[in-house]
């Protein structure tokens, strides 16, 4: 059996300034490079392991991602879609296809449903062969997709179950190929754009976890999945920053040949979500920056994390906000570490060298709608090439439910550590700021 493998990854913030308006922002992987080598606990790693069968040949085609988190321009999308479709067509006879998606990609009209348009075209040229796909929890899923393939999205937020969903997708595809099952999927759109901080499904703190709406609904979802003939049920968070008709939440249920049951279970969870939607706003309070900094300074347990929801690099924000740094300096905080994306500061620090004192405007240079650059003086503490190893699965997380056995090399480009004020260490990087503790450790913090 020959199974084609293709990928399209992008979480599109349609409000972001940095858009993908040329092929220069496109990253393409092809051939064996597309398939992970060794034991990798992510979607693709799970699928490859699950499809490891003597009679299965995985046929890697193309995987495409993008540099910027903003809107994909129509011409760029058309070119990328054509490249993937051509690669599938040229792969020779295929018995099935696995798509690795993020699921929240938005391109200019008429391609708002970017993944759906790709799946439709793939179905048109490949005919009625079995297809499965893995998706992020924040996927903006459409009816086009569930009509054309069997989806296996994250059940967790923060996302720590990509590997397991990949295994499930592989198992489902192999069973479809041998005729064991005939999946049918039903999707219910729930017109709710939930705040991401209210959409957590688990927590390190048991009492907090019990109060999470999506944790409670996931317990019910897990119980419903034990129903005979049920293959998979998922509550999707959607992605409000991807301004499109399907941006809200949804519930997707897949059964073995029982369309009525799939519809019943999806509707039941969707009703529960809708009637309790107000709970999504009650999870965590949001504090003004100075108040949050002062609260952190009073905490005896460390480390304390300050989360700037307005400049989340994972949601395509510039990651160059200096507002927390400004507050730390103003409140005379000490023993702090943070990251700011600023290529000019990196260049100046490298030129000056370790031990040099520099004065510069930092941050606020990419999107100045909400904050301005901040002038600071600091000592260049270290310089490195930005290559390091992330220990842990997706985003380098350390959730209590994950296996700490994954190591991934990553490269954020040249960076410097600038010590400012009373032991405030700021990592400046040319690309993205880090989403894991190893970003800091590898810089000597």
Identify the role of each PLM range:
Residues 48-76, 80-88:
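Low-complexity, highly charged intrinsically disordered N-terminal segments
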Residues 53-56, 60, 86-95, 292-304:
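Glycine-rich phosphate/diphosphate-binding loops that line cofactor/substrate pockets in enzymes
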Residues 1-53:
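N-terminal amphipathic/basic leader segments beginning at the initiator methionine
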